[in-house]
A protein has these predicted regions:
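Repeated scaffold domains used in trafficking and secretory/extracellular systems
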Residues: 47-59, 99-117, 154-166, 206-218, ...
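N-terminal Sec-pathway targeting helices
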Residues: 1-16
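Short beta-strand elements that form the blades of beta-propeller/WD-repeat-like
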Residues: 54-71, 114-128, 161-180, 218-232, ...
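Long, acidic/polar, low-complexity amphipathic helices and coiled-coil-like
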Residues: 2, 87, 101-224
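Hydrophobic alpha-helical membrane-insertion segments, chiefly the h-region
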Residues: 16-27
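Surface-exposed loop/turn elements that mediate protein-protein interactions on large endomembrane-trafficking
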Residues: 29-48, 74-100, 131-152, 179-205, ...
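Small side chains
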Residues: 11, 20-21, 62, 133, ...
Length: 388
């Protein structure tokens, strides 16, 4: 039943990403909070990136990314973006980079499609074999890779996401049993960097359940618990989403917001979240008061949001309806100043399959099989440029 339901609409996996944690954002608006420091990927847990759609990662002064090449193989590249061709990440002597023996190749059903993370001088991908997903660690110079631990049983619809905190990695399946009709248990697993011991730190049982949009903020792992329902006949869907957080210190998880939260960001005592179909709220943890700052409309029913110290970026995810699974609209990134005055609408193009937001330097999207960028310093007038 699960496979049949998910296969009906090719965008269902994308819908899970859209509905359950599209992107991240920071609140620096009408308050005294200062802008957070955006660090290089060497130490940053990269919470400003979209955890569940992670085909590019910052590190070592540049960016690692995956690309579907003309020969049908997915390869891992490194680039410093401007005026530089991407370098195939393989250190094998005399490698032609044309066979599966190349250490940059992540093709076929052996690896989760296009996913790559960077943390503390290593890259991490998900390696699938014999129905099990393994955490695979790759040297950042492309000199080698190894499977370090088993994570989850996986099928072709599974999509494992990773979040990093200090010396631990947290993993979950962001598709889970979304669209299924049976009760399943979804888990967040903790992996200790070093011995790579695995333990389960959170479980949720529900029909059509998935855990999505997890991010590291301070002493907590925040995440969205979704129960996704799909009507096969009418092609309508509905996602019940609630925001939770797991306390790293005491190991206790609690519900934070009991609304339809499509995305969120935490800055100190301030929580910013987007309620599907309603808009963007700013919530104060201390006073427990909130204000609606951006009203949802037909062009932005859900939103992923990022902030770079100067501007806010709201991605409408191309979602045309909260109930019609097939309804799509033009995918647009709306750029706002700190007072939420709209200053630009950036068309992502009809071939856009992902928005990554990036860091203080670049805004990234994926168009078909290519990653494109706009320099943040040119955000008011710049156009998309394809990575070489």
């Amino acid at each position: 039943m699960k496979k049949k339901k998910i296969a009906v609409i090719t965008g269902i996996v994308a819908a899970v990403v859209i509905l359950g944690g599209i992107a991240t954002y920071v609140y620096v608006f009408k308050n005294n909070h200062s802008a957070p420091e955006i660090k290089d990927g060497v130490t940053d847990t990269q919470s400003s990136w979209n955890t569940d759609t992670h085909h590019i990662a910052a590190g070592n002064g540049g960016y690692y990314y995956t690309q579907y090449d003309a020969d049908g193989k997915i390869r891992l590249y490194y680039t410093q973006v401007e005026n530089e061709n991407g370098v195939v990440l393989c250190a094998l002597p005399e490698c032609t980079h044309k066979t599966d023996a190349c250490r940059a190749v992540l093709s076929g059903e052996a690896y989760q499609f296009g996913t790559v993370y960077y943390y503390k001088d290593f890259l991490y991908v998900i390696h699938k074999k014999e129905g099990m997903g393994y955490l695979c660690k790759i040297a950042s110079d492309g000199s080698g890779r190894e499977d370090v631990c088993a994570l989850f049983a996986m099928d072709k619809f599974s999509s494992v996401s990773l979040v990093f905190h200090e010396n631990d990695i947290y993993a979950y399946d962001s598709v889970g049993n979304a669209g299924g009709s049976e009760n399943h248990v979804q888990e967040i697993k903790k992996i200790s960097i070093g011995d790579y011991a695995v333990s389960t730190v959170y479980e949720y049982s529900g029909v059509g359940a998935a855990i999505t949009g997890a991010r590291d903020f301070g002493g907590y792992l925040y995440f969205i618990v979704m129960e996704y329902r799909l009507d096969m006949d009418s092609k309508t869907h509905y996602a019940d989403e609630r925001l939770y957080r797991y306390d790293y210190g005491n190991g206790i998880a609690e519900k934070v917001i009991d609304k339809q939260v499509s995305d969120y960001f935490v800055l100190g005592d301030t929580l910013v979240y987007f309620e599907s179909g309603t808009g963007l709220y700013v919530y104060d943890f201390k006073t427990q008061k909130e204000t609606l700052e951006v009203q949802a409309d037909k062009n932005i029913l859900v939103a992923g949001i990022s902030y770079d110290g100067q501007y806010f970026y709201l991605d409408n995810a191309g979602m045309g309806s909260l109930t019609d699974a097939a309804s799509r609209i033009e995918r647009v990134i709306y750029v706002y100043d700190r007072s939420f005055n709209l200053i630009r609408e950036i068309d992502c193009g009809k071939d856009c399959t992902g928005v990554y937001f990036g860091d203080e330097k670049y805004l990234f999207i994926k168009q078909l099989d290519a990653i494109c960028y706009i320099k943040k310093e040119d955000i008011l007038n710049g156009e998309w440029v394809q990575l070489k």
